[in-house]
Amino acid sequence: SSSSAASDVYKRQLVERCHDSLIEVAGVVKAVSSLPEIVRVYEESGVKFIATSRISQMRAIREAGICKKPLMLIRIPMLSELPDVVELCDISLQSDIIVLRALNEEAKKQGKVHEVILMMDLGDLREGFWNEEDALDAALEIEHELKNLRLAGVGVNLSCYGSVLPTKRNMQGLVSLASDIEREIGRKLDYISGGASTSAYMAMNGTMPYRINLLRLGDIGLRGETDNFAPDFLETGVMTIKAEVIECRDKPSFPVGELGVNAFGEVGHYEDRGIRRRALVAMGRVDYGNCFDLIPRMEGIEVIGASSDHTILDVEAVKDKVHVGDVLEFGIKAYGPMAYLTSSDGVHMVFKGGKQNA
């Protein structure tokens, strides 16, 4: 299998349009395992931060020496990884006062001042302070007692777990909280971070409330679209998966025998369509996650299902016959396959476009 990266011109357009709305961008590279080629594209596009969720990726970026931008940790950290957080990251998202106190002690040990963004939960029910009073107390403690931390801003996560969409109402709620914190600490915050790629459409259409000035964007820059937004100035289809056909023959479309569960403990759903031409390609769920996130590029191919190492295709309607040894191409229609594909040892990656050629 192989994949190709987008030209940096598209990400630059995205960043510049955010800048037009007075919004900085943290370029999120976790979905492509912080590949150096992608990190370079984001850095050259003018992002404020390079962001990822895993310390191992942070270390790889630092050791590769490819990034001059500040690094942002976007998963709230484990207590056990705080030494690495202080060593490797310039700024991190935080939502727990116990962790903040321990982080302050670690920063003191390392002789650093570490910047933090306090996360608020506005309904998506993942990370974040639920009560405004708790957030205000944490902000005051950071400002006046935790001398090796600097409160850089507040933020929110939406759409990742609870499917809650960004709206003017919840964005304005975040701005109001930021204003309350600013009154308490007596200074302006640097950043009010209004979410991730699903918030981009508000920045593009002018509905983002004033003072939201940082978005954490990965998916939309990598795929050129999200589930709720497909701007015409971004190119889609920038990742191509190639896989070789290892079997092709006519078979029944409904399993024959007593049925149980599949290799993943799931009850399968099968439609009896009679005898159909089927092809297997040499990639499976360990390579990309959900097979129904794949988009066959050849007309007439339908994804039927997958096991760990095989993908099953219906090729009955393909005009030109599919043969063993053919290499078929697929696009993706979701975020998940990128994370799998770029971390799989079984996937060979090729980068085209922009300044990358490999």
For the regions a language model picked out, list residue spans one by one.
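Loop/helix-junction capping segments adjacent to catalytic residues or to phosphate/diphosphate-binding pockets
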Residues: V9, P36, Y161-V164, G289, ...
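Conserved, mostly hydrophobic/aromatic
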Residues: S7, K30, I61, L118, ...
